[in-house]
Amino acid sequence: MDITFIRHGHAEHLLNYPKELNRLHPGLTEQGKKQIVSLRKNINIMPHDTIVVSPTKRTLETVELLMTNEHNGAVISPLVGPRMYPQDPKFAPLGCDQIYSMAELSLLYPDKQYIDVGLEAWEESINQMNTQQFTRLAEQLLAWCRKQTGHTFIVSHDGTITNYRMMLVEHDLTRDDFLGEAGYYTVRDV
């Protein structure tokens, strides 16, 4: 199975950096929307492919712009929500990285499906989970992905994507290895 990680486009919390980092649920900017529309030329999502998306406004908007009408839709998982990289318990989570609750998602995106990963990942989020707990839950998500058909696309955040890349194939990554706005990276034969 191959996984392509996609980083969301430019979002509202970066407009007045760093003053807007505690903004709740920032969406994509016009620039971010254009980045994702441009990304569609490089990403070919087929109807049978699996899309897993972080429960944040900017990633859900990214998926809406990436998907074609033929695709069945994306599934939401807190296991691809924002996660700090590198991990440091001294840093407080930022407001922009707060995920939607299941109640909020059911109101805002009633047609979306969820991957059942247990309540702990929704309530605690993966942002500051210790490495062992994150790895255990991430392995469960990857096992679920392996059972799906087609290619898997994960629409997420720089820190989260880097944590998964470290877990899967790469080591010694730094913030310099972040994909950046609307960036993507494919891991083969997961």
Can you describe what each PLM-predicted range is?
Residues 169-190:
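Domain-level recognition of soluble alpha/beta enzyme cores
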Residues 22-27, 70-137:
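Phosphate-handling substructures
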